[in-house]
Amino acid sequence: MRFLHLSDLHLGKRVCEFSMLDDQRYILEQILSLLDSTPVDGVLLAGDLYDKPVPPAEAVRLLDWFLTQLAERQLPVFAISGNHDSADRIAFGAALLQNSQVYVSPVFSGAPMPIPLTDEYGTLDVYLLPFLKPAMVRHVWPDEPVETYNDALACVLRHCPPDPEHRSVLVAHQFVAGAACCESEEVSVGGVDSVDASLFDAFDYVALGHLHSPQKVGRDTVRYCGTPLKYSFSEARQHKSACFVELGPKGEVSITTAPLTPKHDLREVRGSYMELTDRRRYADTAVDDYLHITLTDEQDVPDALARLRVIYPNLMRLDYDNLRTREDQQITAPERAESITPLEHFSAFYQLQNNQPLTAAQAAFCQQLIEEIWKEGEDA
């Protein structure tokens, strides 16, 4: 049985105040073309379908279009909510969507039930586990000792052990310890939100979302597929791809990838103002790519951002690197500001006030308080 593993679409995302919606539709159309040429038995969507809990209407319409296209191809879809999503909004209409073979994780209320599929090798069970926080699990099992994210995941998986006679696929959205991160991801200080890869040992394949770099964690079959598009300049040198996973007889899993080509690449360019405005330099380049330009001029160029955008209309970020400034003084910095979590803000404040960092226990306690406050705000 063959699946396409996708995650972190982040529909509606803005990078340095540039809307990515047109680029997102372009890459989704490319993914549909891949599916037309590479048959699969289902699509796994491992969370962060949207970039915000309350997405813009255009993003909602784009996801609706994409799911409709998959349903018209009679492809089962297995989707979960991520930390950027509102679980309630993602789960809206889930019971109706099942009639079109679109299976969406409900708001977490207990151990996920397997969704059985069959092929010539027998039964394959798909488990949908939305993004988990310890408070969610304590609410369901108040007598369980759940303090950390690892405790929370371990508790849930104890209550839904996969049938050892069946092949099993888990779709989840957590930060697994040991994985590599990018600037555009939300990862808590001290790794308080991390879980251990060994918790997934009972599953044949674990389709993960949350991290934007494609990578395995521990074993080949515990995998982040990464984002289909680059969402930060820390990803500029990455090559995005679609991840296909095929499960044969029990224990046999193979993984292949197909490259994805964006409408506009996201690149870093370096040079002096004169070099970058020399037609011979840029004539054969994709000047409409999303760019981070670093100028090496010793003196600031007046109105450099506007003047460079005449040639490079999608210039997102402009820095200088010279003798006077070696600390990467950003002229536009919304990308980094959006990526700082509340815990990171408090941790920096605490260290400034106390001249020492938060301990792991303090960070875990603060993270718990932050989540409780946010939960109260969502319920208000």
Question: What is the predicted role of each segment?
Answer:
Residues 55, 84-218:
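His/Asp/Glu-rich metal-coordinating catalytic cores
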Residues 72-77, 166:
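A short helix->loop->beta-strand "cap" motif at the edges of active sites that frequently abuts
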Residues 112-124, 129, 222-287:
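Binuclear metal-dependent phosphoesterase catalytic core
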Residues 4, 44, 78, 105, ...:
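Hydrophobic/aromatic beta-strand patches that form the interior of the parallel beta-sheet core
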Residues 35-39, 119-120, 162-165, 284-286:
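Glycine-rich phosphate-binding loop signature in dinucleotide/nucleotide-binding domains
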Residues 1-68, 72, 362-372, 376, ...:
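N-terminal active-site segment of His-dependent metallophosphoesterases
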Residues 37, 42, 247-380:
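Accessory, non-catalytic peripheral segments of nucleic-acid enzymes
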